[in-house]
Amino acid sequence: MHLSDFYFDLPDELIARYPKPERSSSRLLRLSGENGDISHHTFSDVYDLINEGDLLIFNNTRVIPARMYGRKASGGKIEVLIERVLTESRFLAHVRSSKAPKAGTELILGEDKLGEGKGVKAVMIGRQDALFELEITEKSTALLDILQKIGHMPLPPYIDRPDEDADQERYQTVYSKIPGAVAAPTAGLHFDEELLAKLKAKGVNFAFVTLHVGAGTFQPVRVNNIEEHHMHAEYVEVPQQVVDAIVATKAAGKRVIAVGTTSVRSVESAALAAQEKGFAQIIEPFFADTSIFIYPGKQFRVVDCLITNFHLPESTLIMLVSAFAGYKNTMNAYKSAVENRYRFFSYGDAMFITKNNHVKGLD
C-alpha cells in the first residue's frame, strides 16, 4: 500500500478553525462498513444510532497547556511543546529555535504571560532522538501548576491561529479527567452533558480508558510504503473495569463503540497483548506504551463501531478508518463529506462507522 493511496483533495475553507457554538450541533456522517451506505445527520442524532446495552469507550485524558514561549538566557527566542511529562519538574519536548539548545542551556519561559523578567527558569538536560529533555529549576511548584500559569493550549498546526481563552474549554472533552495529553481526543468534543445524560438514561454503558495523546499524532508519514512506517509511542491505561465491561457487552451480544481513534488504539492494544500472551479472554488489563499501527488488513478484536472526526490526507488515522470501514468505503465517504461541505479535523464534524468484517487490503 502506498502513501498516495490515502490522499484526497481538501479545500482549505473546509478546515474548521473554530468549534461550532454547541458541541452536539456538529454534523455527523453515518457510514456502513458492511455496504458503504452513507447518510447525513446532526451529531445529537447519535442517540438514535446507539442501542440500549451498547458500550461507549471514552478516552478521559485531559489536555494540558503544553505550549510555552520564551528565550534562551543568552537571548534567542524559543518555543517549547511538551510531548510527555516525566516527573514533577522534568519533561520531554519539541523545541523550536534558530539553533538547537545544547545540554546545560538555560531557558526563560512564560514571560509573555508573567511579564518581562518574571519568567520561569528551565535547563536543557539532554536529547532523546528528536525530543529534548528539559527540567524546571523552580522545584517548589509542580509542573502542571506552572503550565496553568504560563502555558498555551496546544492547538494543532492546521488550525493556524493563536490559542484563545475559549479554547481552554472547547479543546477539552466534558469528561476529561487525567491531565497529560498535548492534543485532544477530538471525537469526544461533540458530547455535551445533556447528550451523555440522555444516553445513560437510555441504558447505554460507559467505560473510560486513558491514552495521553502526544504531539506525534500530527507527524506526517514519511515513507511511501506505509508498512514501513513506525508509530510514535503513547502511554495507555486499560483498567480491569473496562475489560469487565467489554467482556460483559460481548457476552450480551451488544456492541462496543469506540469514541475516537485513541480509544480504538487503547483497547485493540490491550486485546493484541492478551492474544500474544496466550490469554483465553479477548482482552486483559493493559498499562504500557503502545505504538500500534492499524492499517487495511489489520484485524479489530474488540471494536464494533467507531465515532471519529475527519482526518488529514495521508495520515495514519485515515488509514485506521480505512482498516475499519474498508478502503473504498472510506474514500467514498470522504469524497461525499467534501462535496457536502463537512468541516474537517479537530474542531470539525464527525462520522459514525459500523465495522466492515471483510477488509483485506485496498479492497
Curated annotation (Swiss-Prot):
GO CC terms, sorted? cytoplasm
**Keyword hit for Nucleotide-binding:** no
User: Which InterPro entries did the record assign?
Assistant: QueA, QueA_dom1, QueA_dom2, QueA_sf
Q: Report the enzyme's class at the first EC level.
A: transferase
Q: Which domain of life is it from?
A: Bacteria
Record EC number: 2.4.99.17
Q: Does the keyword Transferase apply?
A: yes
Entry GO MF terms: S-adenosylmethionine:tRNA ribosyltransferase-isomerase activity
Entry function: Transfers and isomerizes the ribose moiety from AdoMet to the 7-aminomethyl group of 7-deazaguanine (preQ1-tRNA) to give epoxyqueuosine (oQ-tRNA).
The protein depicted here goes by the name S-adenosylmethionine:tRNA ribosyltransferase-isomerase
